[in-house]
Amino acid sequence: MTTRAASANLANARMMHNMEEAGHMANLKGRPHTSHASQRNTLGDIGNQVSAITISDVPRKDPIIKKEIVHLSSHQHKILTKSKATTSLKSLAEESHIPKKQEAFTFLEPVAAMPKPTTVPTATVLPQPTVPVPMDISENVPESFSRVLLNVQNIDANDKENPQLVSEYVNDIYDYMRDLEGKYPIRHNYLENQEITGKMRAILIDWLCQVHHRFHLLQETLYLTVAIIDRLLQESPVPRNKLQLVGVTSMLIASKYEEMYAPEVADFVYITDNAYTKKEILEMEQHILKKLNFSFGRPLCLHFLRRDSKAGQVDANKHTLAKYLMELTITEYDMVQYLPSKIAAAALCLSMKLLDSTHWTETLTHYSSYCEKDLVSTMQKLASLVIKAENSKLTAVHTKYSSSKFMKISKLAALKSPLVKELAAASV
């Protein structure tokens, strides 16, 4: 009996539980949603400002609440709907008497986003870049005030198109060459108290002129050879039996310095009739290089004559006659102390006077840095050398310029004119 009674009580309890559960579900379905409607109207003012809602409005106590991740695409707004978790949240809130402020809520359908204003892109006006003003490189450059006063012509005005003539800084080059003249001077009477005399020097250089002519070397090579000999003899005395060795070795060094194809050492051994060996020439070359400190940049007369001839606008006859007058000086021991620039200017000035009595212009004075008064004593010395060359035993230079290659300039009748005799007589 007790068993039956217990079974009956258990059946009644189950029935009562089912009835209560059914009634509870019916109440949930029939309940009006007025309170939620009012909340939705209030939340409806928010629009689709989803970012204004924070997580702090959702109760965090109950672990039953499940977070849902809502993804909003950039092209369409998804509508947030009530989920099962929200429904269960509501029933739990009612059963546990949670205040309405903490009740879970769902979002209304978002208000359609306002269309973005269509803005017409306007063209941005960029500032125009400033064009740099090109530097004035025209040839109409005003002359310096001093040059205008002196009536000096610009002899390099037509050379700007030829880069080899370096018209932009050719004057600076010649200023530098004049400075080098003072750096490598030749002393007057430097052979005093030496075994070598001025006459021996003249014989050596006259023979070297013949060697130079036979090897068909440049004019610069001859002048540089003489400059090396004079600089060495004034620095280091040389015995008489080594003088010819010094001469051929100096020409070897000058050929290497000036020529494109320099003669070989064997050529100089042959030209001396085997008086010196190849080894002796090479040893003397080392000696000269060390004594002169490998410096062979002393300016030559020929460099200045070319500049002066351009400034004077002289013809080939005057230029060749000036070359002949200059070359007469290389054998003259008494003129070793003269500056190459002064010898070149005096030779050209005398050449102009002998051929057509042309005067020394202001342009020549400007570019040569010598006026006519400064050249008188040098011209007198040159005139005496012209008369001396007619009867001298050292005929290499005179014979060289008597050929048709040099316009037979040494045979000109002007060299026997009264002007030459007058200038030679004034020379002391």
Swiss-Prot record:
List the protein's name: G2/mitotic-specific cyclin-B
Highest taxon of source: Eukaryota
Q: Which PANTHER family match?
A: CYCLINS
State whether it acts alone or in a complex, and with which partners, per the record.
Interacts with the CDC2 protein kinase to form a serine/threonine kinase holoenzyme complex also known as maturation promoting factor (MPF). The cyclin subunit imparts substrate specificity to the complex.
GO molecular-function term, one example from the UniProt record: cyclin-dependent protein serine/threonine kinase regulator activity
One GO biological process term? mitotic cell cycle phase transition
Query: Which SUPFAM superfamilies does the record match to this protein?
Result: Cyclin-like
Q: Which family does it belong to?
A: Belongs to the cyclin family. Cyclin AB subfamily.
Classification via InterPro entries: Cyclin (IPR039361), Cyclin-like_dom (IPR013763), Cyclin-like_sf (IPR036915), Cyclin_A/B-like (IPR046965), Cyclin_C-dom (IPR004367), Cyclin_N (IPR006671), Cyclins_cyclin-box (IPR048258)
Summary of the function given for this chain in its UniProt record: Essential for the control of the cell cycle at the G2/M (mitosis) transition.
Enumerate the UniProt keywords alphabetically: Cell cycle, Cell division, Cyclin, Mitosis
